[in-house]
Structures are given as C-alpha cells and as structure tokens.
C-alpha cells in the first residue's frame, strides 16, 4: 500500500525485453534507494512493482503483460521521468489517501490551463469510468493522490498547486499526454458489491 505522496522523481535509464517480461532500470537519488532491498514494493508512476535488483542509485523492476496492458510502462523511453514512492510501513503517516498501486486504466490530458505557478488539468478517463468519480473525492494520477474538481461523465479537472508540480512529473503533462489512473478503492468495492 502507498500514501499517494511522491517521495522522489526517477529517470528511466534502460528498458529491456525477455520474452513477455519488460525490465525497467530506474535511476533515483541514493537517499531514496539506500533503505530499499530486493523484494520491496515501489510505486513507479503509481504502478506497484517489485524491486528485483538494486545498484547504488539504480533500481530494476520487471513488468508482466497484464501490467503492460493497463499502464504507461509500454510507452516509456530512455529519459522518461517517473514518480516514485516506497510502500508504507507501520506507523508511517498517510499524507494523501491510501492507494494500492493497482492501476485501473489510463486517461489522456484534454486541456491544460496555467494560472501563475499553478495549473488546471482536464483528464478524460472515458465514460465507462465516470461512476468512480465524484467531486472532492480522490484519485491517483501517476501515483499522486489528487483531489477531484468538476466532473462531466468520465472527464474531470484537477487543480494542481506549485508544490505538486515541483515534486512530481505532473508538471510535464501537455495536451494528449497519457496518465495512469487508480480510482478510490472504497468506491471500487461498492460498485463490485452492487447487485446486477
């Protein structure tokens, strides 16, 4: 589990394929990597991945076809900036909302408005996902816990403050950019339990 508060920005150093498995090499600060060990879970742009190898400031992760089909990983190239968060430990504070690292779908940026050092970003998740969105609720965007603004069917707006833009890759979003989306898990459970 994760808090949705990005702890560091990483950079994709290499991407390799072996059969259906894609291996990511991610560079981060040594301050971020120093306490990690093989087998630990790390959210990479909100995707829960298992650390398979660590070398100083480098981390290695494997992604399987199911993960590749639902996330941005398949579109990564060398130099891509990714949001990083280690998994929560007992007694850690939760500054955002609990996220699982299991991405539901990807959305695309429909509009970006700049307001001084802040930005309003409109994201289209698709009409089928509209039932998981409600104003002032939470959503995970590339692993960031964000409060939802206005909603129209499967399209929503988020208001991003300067600190969020400084600390995450959301500042790099432009029209047409793709993002990983994780909807509020409590809403997912409610809809799963509804009679059909």
Predicted regions: what is each one?
Residues 1-193:
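Conserved loop->alpha-helix
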């Amino acid at each position: 589990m994760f808090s949705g508060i990005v702890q560091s920005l990483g950079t994709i150093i290499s991407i390799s394929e072996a059969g259906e498995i894609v291996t990511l090499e991610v560079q981060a600060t040594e301050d971020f990597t120093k306490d990690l060990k093989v087998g630990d879970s790390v959210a990479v742009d909100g995707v829960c991945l298992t650390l398979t190898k660590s070398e100083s400031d480098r981390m290695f992760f494997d992604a399987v076809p199911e993960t590749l089909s639902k996330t941005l990983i398949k579109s990564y190239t060398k130099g891509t900036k990714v949001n990083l968060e280690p998994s929560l430990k007992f007694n850690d504070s939760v500054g955002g909302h609990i996220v699982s690292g299991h991405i539901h779908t990807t959305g695309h940026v429909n509009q970006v408005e700049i307001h001084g050092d802040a930005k309003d970003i409109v994201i289209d998740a698709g009409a089928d996902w509209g039932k998981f969105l409600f104003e002032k609720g939470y959503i995970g965007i590339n692993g960031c816990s964000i409060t939802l603004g206005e909603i129209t069917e499967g399209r929503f707006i988020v208001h991003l403050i300067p600190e969020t833009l400084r600390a995450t890759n959301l500042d790099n979003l432009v029209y047409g950019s793709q993002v990983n989306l994780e909807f509020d898990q409590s809403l997912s459970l409610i809809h799963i339990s509804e009679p059909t």
